[in-house]
Amino acid sequence: ISITVNRFYKNPKYQSFKSNIHIFIDDKLANGTWPTTYIDNILEINPDCKIILNADWYYLEIFSKYRNEKNIFWIKLNLISSFFDNFKTDLTKIVSMGGGVVECAISLSIFLGSKNLNILGVEGNGISRLMCNQDSHFDGEDGDYDNHNSLMFANDMISSARSIRQWHRISHLLDKRNINIYNLTKEGILDAYEYKSFDIATK
């Protein structure tokens, strides 16, 4: 099973494997920062891909055309506690997430029966790179942040800090469940999960 998220479908490498599942839960898709044509683009490139959307968006007018789309699934989300084991992976009820879409993908992978999870392309230092006017994504700088001021970056850092704590929390919870999780990206700060080379993971 391969799961991709957000704008990864724009990566040239996407054409080589075309994921089974793609997830959008970022509010940027609901508030207009990202166009809903992202969904159309994925279905055009990869017609068999199952797309996961946030159930809170179901009745928003901009998503009305997708309500009866057979390859789109709407899921309810629940934040992971840093103190209690409320990590839920039952897709038929509610799926846990932490600071964002990566944690949701982990929950979904476990629900689908995965015991060995590999994460690729998560560095965890995107906000700090943007603050230093450096490229933060595979396609360069993120245009979503062109008009960001210091307060907006401060709020983003709070969200990033929560995500990092959630990665470590998930690592602890998965260890208790005998589920292995690996990081295939050597750059960045994602040290909550053991590093494994991409070549070994794809043998």
Question: Can you say where each PLM-predicted feature lies in the sequence?
Answer:
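Metal-ion/cofactor- or nucleotide/acyl-coenzyme-handling active-site neighborhoods
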Residues: 1-203
